[in-house]
């Protein structure tokens, strides 16, 4: 079969690492070869808002969101590997993007 690339994103890195560990364990049980997890750069989104609703522009508050990401490559995936990945119960906070790639 082809190579499968998984990109996982989450706001909490602890939940992301637990999910990656569960995926790696499930893939290794089926006998497929896995590359990764590769930690991707953390994306930081910053927002600045005024504290006051009317005046005083000098008084501001800053917020940020950190998006942590990991990448996994499953090489020589078998049908059992795909079946175990679809049956895996993952955390709802983690966004998983799956792409099947050529050899």
Curated annotation (Swiss-Prot):
Superkingdom, natural source? Bacteria
Per UniProt, the keywords (alphabetical) are: Ribonucleoprotein, Ribosomal protein
Q: Which SMART domains match?
A: Ribosomal_S10 (SM01403)
Question: Ribonucleoprotein as a keyword?
Answer: yes
Q: Which GO terms describe its molecular function?
A: structural constituent of ribosome; tRNA binding
Query: Which GO BP terms, alphabetically?
Result: translation
Q: Cross-referenced InterPro entries, in alphabetical order?
A: Ribosomal_uS10 (IPR001848), Ribosomal_uS10_CS (IPR018268), Ribosomal_uS10_dom (IPR027486), Ribosomal_uS10_dom_sf (IPR036838)
Q: Does the keyword Disulfide bond apply?
A: no
Q: Which cysteines are joined by disulfide bonds?
A: none
One of the record's GO cellular component terms: ribosome
State the similarity comment. Answer: Belongs to the universal ribosomal protein uS10 family.
HAMAP family from the UniProt entry? Ribosomal_uS10
- What is the protein's known function? Involved in the binding of tRNA to the ribosomes.
Assembly and binders: Part of the 30S ribosomal subunit.
Name the record gives this protein? Small ribosomal subunit protein uS10
Q: Where is the organism placed in the taxonomic lineage, from the top?
A: Bacteria, Pseudomonadati, Campylobacterota, Epsilonproteobacteria, Campylobacterales
Which gene name does the record give?
Answer: rpsJ
């Amino acid at each position: 079969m082809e190579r499968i690339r998984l990109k996982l994103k989450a706001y909490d890195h602890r939940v992301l690492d637990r999910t990656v560990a569960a995926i790696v364990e499930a893939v290794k049980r089926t006998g497929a070869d896995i590359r990764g997890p590769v930690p991707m750069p953390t994306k930081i989104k910053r927002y600045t808002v005024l504290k006051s609703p009317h005046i005083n522009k000098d008084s501001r508050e800053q917020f940020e969101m950190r998006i942590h990401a990991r990448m996994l490559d499953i090489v020589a995936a078998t049908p059992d590997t795909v079946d175990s990945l679809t049956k895996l119960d993952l955390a709802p906070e983690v966004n998983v993007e799956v792409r099947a790639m050529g050899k």
